[in-house]
C-alpha cells in the first residue's frame, strides 16, 4: 500500500512538469487536445512505473553493479513481486496498440516492452539496485497480457482512440518522462514529501 501511495506522490510531482510541457507540445506539434490528454495519461502512467521500479535521479545517484543473469531464480523465490511486475506492465501493453498502429503485432509490442524494461533495468545500475533478467521477463509478459486484452477489444484495436498518433510521439513521450523523472521531478517530490510527512 505504501508503494502505491509513494508512486502517487511521485506521479503528482512529475505532473507539475508533464502538464505544461505537454501543453507546449500541443501548441507546437500535437495540435490536438484530445491527443495531448491521452498522451498525458500515458505520461502519468510511465512516471508512476519509473517511481515504482526505482528509476535513478540526479539527486541520489549511486553506482553499484549488481546483476542477475540467471532466469527464474528470483521469480520463484519472490512470486508476489513477480506478479506485481506483471501487473505493472499490463497497461503498457494495452496503451501501445490502441494508440499506435505500429504496435499492432505481438512481435513489435514485445520488442518495445523488452527495450523499455531493459532500459529501466540498466538504469538501476545507478540506483544501487539489482539489474535482474527476471524483471525483464515478467515485464514483457505483462506487456503481452495487456496486448491480448487490447486485442479482445476489437473496436479499440482496429480503430485507434486518436487517429493522428505518430510513432515518433511515442519516443517523445517516453524520452520526456525519463528526462523529467531524472532531472526535475526529484526536487518537487522532496517538497511534497515534506508536506505529507
Give the role of each language-model region.
Residues 130-132:
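Membrane-interface catalytic loops of GT-C/OST-like multi-pass glycosylation enzymes that act
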Residues 1-122, 126-127, 151-197:
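Bulky hydrophobic segments
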